[in-house]
Amino acid sequence: MSLRTLVLLKPDAVRRGLVGAILSRYEAKGLTIVAMEQRTIDAAVADQHYAEHVAKEFYPPLRDFVTGGPLVALVLEGDNSVDVVRLLNGATDGSKAAPGTIRGDFSLSNRENLVHGSDSPESAEREIGIWFPGL
C-alpha cells in the first residue's frame, strides 16, 4: 500500500555532504520525493517533533544537535514507505547498524546518526503535519 513518511536528513548529513548519497538510496528503492526543504529549525519545532522525548535526560543534547545547523526535511511516498525507510536507515545507534544501511555505512555516533524516519503511519501523519502543514 502506498504511504507517505517523513524523513529528516539531520545537520550531520548536511554538514558532511551526504544528502545526495542518502536521497539516492531512497529513490533507488522506488520511493518518490513528494516535498523537500532545507531549513534550520528552532527549539520549538524540535520540541514539537520530539514531544515524547522532551522530558528525557538525553533530549537537551539532541535538541541542541538538531537545531545547530541546517537539515533537510522531506516527505517520501511509496509502497510500505515507513518500513522501507526504517530498513534503509538501519539501527538508531550507528555503531550497531548493519553494513549496507545508511547509518551502518555513514554514521559516526549514536547521536549524530544522520537520519530520522517516522516509526509508524500514525507518526508519519503527525510529523508531516508539523513539517509540511497542508500537505
Swiss-Prot record:
ATP binds at residues 10, 58, 86, 92, 103, 113. It is an enzyme of class 2 (transferase). It catalyses: a 2'-deoxyribonucleoside 5'-diphosphate + ATP = a 2'-deoxyribonucleoside 5'-triphosphate + ADP; a ribonucleoside 5'-diphosphate + ATP = a ribonucleoside 5'-triphosphate + ADP. Its EC number is 2.7.4.6. Signal peptide: none annotated. The active site is at residue 116. GO terms for biological process: CTP biosynthetic process; GTP biosynthetic process; UTP biosynthetic process. PROSITE patterns: NDPK (PS00469), NDPK_LIKE (PS51374). Its main location: cytoplasm. It comes from the Bacteria. One of its GO terms (cellular component) is cytoplasm. Major role in the synthesis of nucleoside triphosphates other than ATP. The ATP gamma phosphate is transferred to the NDP beta phosphate via a ping-pong mechanism, using a phosphorylated active-site intermediate. Homotetramer. Belongs to the NDK family. This is Nucleoside diphosphate kinase. It comes from Nocardioides sp. (strain ATCC BAA-499 / JS614). The gene is ndk.
